[in-house]
Amino acid sequence: MKLPITDKNKILTLIPQRTPIVMVDALWEYTPTEGVAGLTVVPSNLFVQQGVFLESGLIEHIAQSIALHKGYYYYLNGKPAPMGYIGAIKKIEIQSLPKVGDTLKTHITIQQEFMDVTLVTMQTFVGDTLIAQGEMKTVLAPNP
């Protein structure tokens, strides 16, 4: 799979989430410590109300951007995408909420990894406008 990845079926092989909770539709860039994921907000999105993408959807999109980055890493290493969880949101600042038709680009940077816990900083843009930023810890579920 070569970047950018915008095919919905390919994205689904990289993340554990399934419709209607899928909040990423593109992986634009990838390095082992950074990535850029995207989402175009559509009217049928579970987190859209009155044409606005809600805070909870934005946070879920950010978490799934991290999951997509991790899933691509596992794909490159010939392993299935693991299940993960938001461990903690250390801080998040939301300057504005996107609207239907907006395309989100979330830049993630891995700050630290220890065992199955990853500390990530993130910034989400619509065009050149920063709409959200913060830090999040994610935790991988143990393999069954």
Where are these regions (language model features)?
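Hydrophobic beta-strand-centered segment that forms part of the acyl-chain substrate-binding groove
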Residues: 3-5, 68-105
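Catalytic strand-loop segment that frames the active site of acyl-thioester-processing enzymes
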Residues: 19-54
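Hydrophobic core residues within well-ordered beta-strands of beta-rich domains
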Residues: 21-23, 104, 118
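Hydrophobic residues on conserved beta-strands that form the core of alpha/beta folds
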Residues: 24-25, 89, 119, 133
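Conserved positions in beta-strands of structured domains
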Residues: 25-28, 90, 95, 109-111
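A conserved, well-ordered hydrophobic junction motif at loop->secondary-structure transitions
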Residues: 40-74
